[in-house]
Regions:
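Extracytoplasmic loops and strand-loop junctions of Gram-negative outer membrane beta-barrel proteins
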Residues: 1, 33-39, 77-81, 121-127, ...
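Gram-negative outer-membrane beta-barrel transporters
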Residues: 22-26, 42-122, 154, 159-162
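C-terminal beta-signal and adjacent terminal beta-strands/loops
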Residues: 65, 113-121, 142-194
Length: 194
């Protein structure tokens, strides 16, 4: 295969950066899995096209934010399947991150949106819209009271969204091949390095 990319990275001012890229990947020998006989096979060629944009702004010496979007398109291999590997790769992904960084304390809030991922064309009508596009939020906090010590707290999936990153059946939780991500959870601890 071969990947080509063209892009722009620029500093708009002392506190703002912007980037934009277009990419294309051409694969000659894509490997796929046949569910009927449980064997891998050569599925032929595939072309992936996409683009991304990202804007980062520092509001002061401690607080910054980044907004980004990535768009991906993979043509359907036949009339019986959806684009983007039969709808399992999202057409769009949004990322919005807020960061605070001080000498002893830092934290970040990340909001991620996965949009237009309907799953297989054969089962798409049975997929709830809430599974085709999902939004999640995660929070991470770190405090360094002394050199070598880090006290941390992470709150993942703040809004307790039911979703999956990996599935062979988007219809509902508990369906064939549904691998859900953890619900709201937190991790807290202390690290010490020397």
């Amino acid at each position: 295969g071969e990947t080509k990319e063209i892009g722009l990275n620029t500093r708009i001012d002392d506190k703002t950066t912007f980037s934009a890229h277009y990419f294309r990947t051409d694969s000659d020998n894509l490997i796929a899995f046949n569910n009927a006989n449980w064997k891998y096979y050569n599925a032929g060629a595939e072309t992936i096209k996409g683009w991304d944009v990202q804007l980062t702004k520092a509001f002061d010496d401690h607080f910054s934010a980044t907004a980004a979007y990535t768009h991906t398109y993979i043509p359907a291999t036949s009339a019986d399947v959806n684009p983007n590997r039969n709808g399992y790769i999202p057409k769009g992904q949004y990322d919005l991150t807020f960061n605070y960084d001080d000498t002893k304390f830092n934290g970040s809030l990340n909001i991620k949106g996965i949009v237009d991922r309907p799953g297989s064309k054969a089962k798409e009508a049975q997929v709830l819209d809430t599974y085709k596009s999902i939004w999640t939020a995660n929070l991470a906090l770190n405090y360094k009271p002394v050199k070598g010590m880090n006290v941390f707290f992470k709150l993942n999936n703040i809004f307790d969204r039911m979703y999956t990153d990996m599935t062979s059946d988007m219809r509902n939780p508990g369906g064939d091949g549904w691998y859900s991500q953890p619900g709201r959870n937190f991790v807290a601890g202390v690290e010490y390095t020397f």
